[in-house]
């Protein structure tokens, strides 16, 4: 197949044109992934704002404000089990939405797409990879070698 624009010596597409097309596809995929991460972070932020607003409304509606000539040292009777359950619900929704906002925000800002990639980035940033390599390459003590040989022998007998 011959092309007029971008022809090489044999009449095929020039490699720079195909490389540019591949780069453009990578950029489009990267843009789509970043947009998805942004939308996840935005959704988690909206969930956090909604849960905070509901919690504030729930707290303010339960406040006891006595009217004139009412005793302010004896609030009206209420169902303590219901109050405790609502407190747990409010705290849980706020904690989960805040945690999800932090997770999606870090993933978006650090360009993390999977848990495996997150683990690798954290290992490199915290220096755990060097420590693992040192431990892996450390010489084995005679006691450890003897124990390893005994365990290997016991497992071979079975």
UniProtKB/Swiss-Prot annotation:
It is found in: Membrane. Its main location: membrane. It comes from the Eukaryota. The chain crosses the membrane at residues 38-60, 84-106. Coiled coil: none annotated. It is a multi-pass membrane protein. Keywords: Membrane, Transmembrane, Transmembrane helix. The keyword Nucleotide-binding does not apply. One of its GO terms (cellular component) is membrane. Residues 136-158 are annotated as: Disordered. Belongs to the AIM11 family. This is Altered inheritance of mitochondria protein 11. The gene is AIM11.
